[in-house]
Swiss-Prot record:
Modified sites of kind Deamidated glutamine: 6, 50, 90
Main location (coarse class): cytoplasm
Phosphoserine modified-residue sites: 45, 122
Gene3D superfamilies: 2.60.40.790
One Gene Ontology molecular-function label: metal ion binding
Organism whose genome encodes this protein: Balaenoptera acutorostrata (Common minke whale)
Protein task: Contributes to the transparency and refractive index of the lens. Acts as a chaperone, preventing aggregation of various proteins under a wide range of stress conditions. Required for the correct formation of lens intermediate filaments as part of a complex composed of BFSP1, BFSP2 and CRYAA.
Gene Ontology BP term (one): negative regulation of apoptotic process
Alphabetical list of InterPro entries matching this protein: A-crystallin/Hsp20_dom, Alpha-crystallin/HSP_16, Alpha-crystallin/sHSP_animal, Alpha-crystallin_N, HSP20-like_chaperone
Ranges where the sHSP domain occurs: 52-162
Region described as Disordered: 144-173
Glycosylation sites: 162
Protein name: Alpha-crystallin A chain
């Protein structure tokens, strides 16, 4: 049984019809047509704001799954190469850091950096952790769980990011 753990603020009571501008801010992504023509969305209601209707795989949102046999983290890092990513395990936490220096794109210069930290369950076998980056930019961090009586082994170490040639098989929510 897979359990999808997501941040609670993404589960809105009214779904995509809830007028929220704070969570619809995607810095460095460019403007959409309705951003330039706000009167089109205000003809419906002055309080209505069109949602961006982005999927989990398209918005940079991470997904954590923990079932009886394994622990998996899916993270969209499509703007980063494996050389730009650092994955470390320190005690009960996995830290994923991505940074690429300033480079030129169609609109000028851009640089990106993120830092995510996740708590590992106590029964994850830290000696068997793996991390891979799919062709479509989905980082998958996974590790098997051990029975509760066995030692999971806690230490600090870096996890290498391997490159996969096929797209991710992560489910979109």
């Amino acid at each position: 049984m897979d359990i999808a753990i997501q941040h609670p603020w993404f589960k809105r009571a009214l779904g995509p019809f809830y007028p929220s501008r704070l969570f619809d801010q995607f810095f460095g992504e460019g403007l959409f047509e309705y951003d330039l023509l706000p009167f089109l969305s205000s003809t419906i209601s002055p309080y209505y704001r069109q949602s961006l209707f982005r999927t989990v795989l398209d918005s940079g949102i991470s997904e954590v799954r923990s079932d009886r046999d394994k622990f998996v983290i899916f993270l969209d890092v499509k703007h980063f190469s494996p050389e730009d990513l650092t994955v470390k395990v320190q005690e009960d936490f996995v830290e994923i850091h991505g940074k690429h220096n300033e480079r030129q794109d169609d609109h000028g210069y851009i640089s990106r950096e993120f830092h995510r930290r996740y708590r590992l369950p106590s029964n994850v076998d830290q000696s068997a952790l793996s991390c891979s980056l799919s062709a479509d930019g989905m980082l998958t961090f996974s590790g098997p769980k051990v029975p509760s009586g066995m030692d999971a082994g806690h230490s600090e170490r870096a996890i290498p990011v391997s490159r996969e040639e096929k797209p991710s098989s992560a489910p979109s929510s």
